[in-house]
A protein has these predicted regions:
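N-terminal beta1-alpha1-beta2 submodule of the flavodoxin-like/Rossmannoid cofactor-binding fold
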Residues: 1-86, 90-111, 153, 165-185
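Beta-strand-loop-alpha "switch" segments that mediate conformational coupling across diverse proteins
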Residues: 155-161
Length: 185
């Protein structure tokens, strides 16, 4: 039986190209492509995404008035069937790049009913080996998914624990797990 092709959007918030969370994104993408899915990876560090100013003009316009890349990324999220959000953990939270995008997505809250059935994967990396140190980050991602992406489904969480130096995640079991997750999405 042939598996239907899915539109997979991977959002890497890693500030380092080939950093640990970025490498896990690449492995997820490799698995998803091998399974026949259409994959796009966005590196937020290569995009301009300013912080939300709380002006709420977006509530009238259905788009943010800031002229940067956030609107286009949110549009891609609206059309994806699988969304991967990947972030390193900085001081018990997601990094600023991903938080800014999440905040800026408020411009399309009225459309968030469109996420029914959208599958989410979370990739979280940290130097600490204790997964509980990532719980606040995961709760923030889950809160966004639960409260703003109503009807979406969490398919899995990949923990890149104990990965501090650039590329250290390659030696961890999660590296293979990311590939397998991509194949199974």
């Amino acid at each position: 039986m042939e598996v239907p092709v899915k539109k997979v959007l991977i959002i890497s918030a890693s500030p380092r190209k080939n950093g640990n969370s970025d490498l896990l994104c690449d492995e997820f993408a490799r698995g998803a492509k091998e399974a026949g899915h259409e994959v796009e990876k966005i590196r937020l560090v290569e995009k301009k995404v300013g912080f939300c100013t709380g002006c709420y003009a977006c509530q009238k316009l259905n788009r943010c008035v800031q002229n940067d890349d956030a609107n286009a990324i949110v549009e891609k999220m609206l059309s994806a069937e699988v969304i991967v959000l990947a972030t390193p953990v900085y001081f018990y939270s997601m990094d600023a790049q991903l938080k800014a995008l999440i905040d800026r997505s408020v411009s399309r809250w009225s459309d968030f009913g469109r996420f029914k059935g959208t599958e989410f994967w979370h990739i979280i990396t940290a130097a600490d080996t204790d997964k509980s140190m990532m719980s606040a980050t995961l709760e923030g991602l889950r809160g966004f998914m639960r409260d703003c992406m109503e009807g979406s489904v969490e398919r899995g969480v990949l923990y890149g624990t104990g990965a501090y130096g650039k590329g250290e995640v390659r030696a961890l079991p999660v590296f293979q797990e990311a590939y397998e997750a991509g194949k199974s999405c």
